[in-house]
Amino acid sequence: VPVKDLDDALNDLVLWYKKHKFRFKPLILAIIIHNQFEHIHPYKDGNGRVGRLLLNFILIKNKYPPINIYLEDRFEYYKILQKYSRIHDLKSSIDFFVRQYKKTLEKVTTKHKEN
């Protein structure tokens, strides 16, 4: 998003969230907000970290555990974000994040059982 449009784009994102936060399941809502924030890309640095914080904030706020994007999956994560920015393909993003969510939960529960 061009610099001159950043304020409007971010305000629109917040308004969209407020209007739709009860319409979607928390994971889907978190993915949409994350992807759109990444598409807006308001900062020179740190957009990914802030986007993942938004993703997990929405999940935790709705009493869902947070999701982790594993280092070995970062390349696919970046490809998904690029695809979303080009053609707003939400299905690929949902598929990716659902797999990551399952992976996160499996790793956490396995680690918990080991201890």
Region spans (language model):
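FIC/Doc superfamily catalytic core
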Residues: 1-115
